[in-house]
Amino acid sequence: YKKDAKKEGFVYIQEKISLDDTITASQLYTLAGKMGARLLSSHLDAILNQNLLPEPQDEEETVYCQLLSKIDALLNSQTMTAQQAEQQIRAYEIFPKTKIEISGFLCIINEANVVDAKATPLDIEFKDSKYLRIKKLTALSGKQMNADSFINGYLK
């Protein structure tokens, strides 16, 4: 979705944030918040003195993310790759939280990684024949636990 620069306002200063394959939504928010505070404090005088003037956003560079719903949180191993699932877990860490059904239990996945071979009951195969290895999850009880605790408490 494209933003409407007229609705979104102007930009005084910006920096790019480099993302790696491990950053979570909360880490990105923290990083962006610190960067925003640093940029504002270092440029506020120039803005107030009109030495730094606003510029319209570049229409080619601006994108808008649609609002997420709880329906977006469900993983589908038939339509997603394991990498897409792992990325969704990190992106939806705060809301709507990524969910999957495991042996009849709807669980929130808190941490996982992609592996090539199945080694535990919590290694879920995806459409690319790779597996999502669930490391931490929240069960219906609301308690976050590691994979072994879930296996011992729910699958045995």
Feature names for model-found ranges:
Residues 67-80:
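Acyl-group handling in specialized metabolite and lipid biosynthesis
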Residues 1-64:
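Donor/substrate-binding cores of folate-linked one-carbon enzymes
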Residues 17, 29, 73-74, 139:
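Generic anion/oxyanion-binding catalytic loop in active/binding sites
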Residues 59-69, 106-110:
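Amphipathic alpha-helical surface "interface" segments used
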Residues 2-4, 65-67, 99, 123-124:
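Short secondary-structure boundary/capping segments
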Residues 78-156:
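An anion-binding loop in the catalytic cleft
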Residues 15, 71-73, 130-132:
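Short amphipathic alpha-helical segments
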Residues 14, 56, 76, 99-101:
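Short, conserved beta-strand edge motifs with alternating hydrophobic and charged residues
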